């Protein structure tokens, strides 16, 4: 049984479906909408997307489990994904993971006691030329050191910016394209 999402989420998915000749093409953005509203994708969210798109839930689940940008369990308000593949590993990704573990007192896949942070190690995020890097919610932070990551996290804790894709995409469209995303928050 699918969970009930807001009327706004329903309308957004209906609008998305109109943008594609085949509604199945809207699976990924529909998953984002469900995740933005619920915080993660549980089985009810998968069912909700499947019902809206008109396909079997297993096909939606295949997409949701393939990509690391979809959270299959609850995460912190700010979810850090540390790239661990070759370029990032050679440039210091392990140190970033260790630093997060020590700073937050959690292991990958856990949520901090205050609910503010979680982190995980993921496969390539596609920013090999600026390794090591992390993605916090939907924003890339590149050429990181543990000290630079601390600066970013401290600023996030102070300013509590909205780092969801829908809001950062809108802001990037307002003349900010080309600036480092870490300067935008």
Over which residues does each language-model region extend?
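Signature of N-terminal electron-transfer/Fe-S-associated modules in redox systems
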Residues: 1-185
């Amino acid at each position: 049984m699918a969970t009930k999402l807001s009327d706004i989420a329903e309308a957004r998915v209906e609008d998305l479906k109109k943008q594609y000749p085949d509604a199945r093409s809207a699976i990924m953005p529909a998953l984002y909408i469900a995740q933005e509203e619920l915080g993660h994708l549980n089985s009810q969210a998968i069912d909700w997307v499947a019902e809206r798109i008109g396909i079997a839930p297993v096909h939606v689940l295949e997409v949701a489990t393939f990509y690391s940008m979809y959270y299959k369990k609850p995460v912190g308000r700010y979810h850090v994904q540390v790239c661990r593949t070759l370029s990032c590993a050679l440039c210091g990704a392990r140190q970033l993971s260790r630093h997060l573990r020590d700073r937050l007192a959690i292991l990958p896949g856990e949520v901090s006691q205050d609910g503010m942070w979680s982190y995980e190690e993921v496969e390539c995020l596609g920013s090999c030329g600026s390794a090591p890097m992390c993605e916090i919610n939907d924003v890339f932070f590149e050429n990181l050191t543990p000290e630079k990551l601390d600066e970013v996290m401290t600023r996030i804790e102070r300013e509590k910016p909205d780092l969801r894709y829908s809001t950062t995409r809108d802001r990037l469209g307002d003349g900010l394209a080309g600036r480092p995303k870490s300067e935008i928050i």
